[in-house]
Amino acid sequence: MDDASKVPWATILRDPRFRAIFFFGLASGLPSSLVFATLSIWLREEGLSRTSIGLIGAAATPYAINFLWAPFVDRLRLGPLTGRLGQRRSWIMACQLMLAPAVIVMGLQSPQTSLLTFGFCALLVSFLSATQDVAIDAYRVEILKPEEYGVGAALAIYGWHTGAFLTGA
């Protein structure tokens, strides 16, 4: 058993780094569960065919291929935002600022009457969320010591599941 696993949870939760990791995990779980689970249930209730649901489900593809643009997230500076927040948090903030309206616009679409627009919104939410995940994972590795990675990963996953639960998945 390493030293980090012996630290009481109360001590861990007082550390602002670990609280940030939990809340970033929560922010990650909210949109991803929308794209993976809640979306297909909603489309089924709207009476869409299984083929249409399957095609819209392909919008989750960015989660599987986000490693392709991870180097850009790692190196591309976001102007003054990077200067104020740093490389990782600027990407997280930028993704959050774009995710909120994308989720709202997706929610305002009727899949029955504007399936293409709805599908594009789902793809955009997925892309932004997958990009945010890249930045969140990099941030976690950057702010923690190697012996804290396990606790950090546990809190991130707990946060993710909390976010997924909150969106009804």
Which residues are covered by each model-predicted region?
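C-terminal ends and interior cores of transmembrane alpha-helices
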Residues: L78-G79, S90-T113
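Central cavity-lining transmembrane alpha-helices of secondary-active solute carriers
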Residues: I53-G79
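Loop-to-transmembrane helix entry/capping segments in MFS-fold secondary transporters
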Residues: R50-T51, V141, P146-L155
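Core transmembrane helices of Major Facilitator Superfamily
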Residues: S32, A64, L124-I136
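Helix-loop boundary and gating motifs at the non-cytosolic
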Residues: D3-Y63
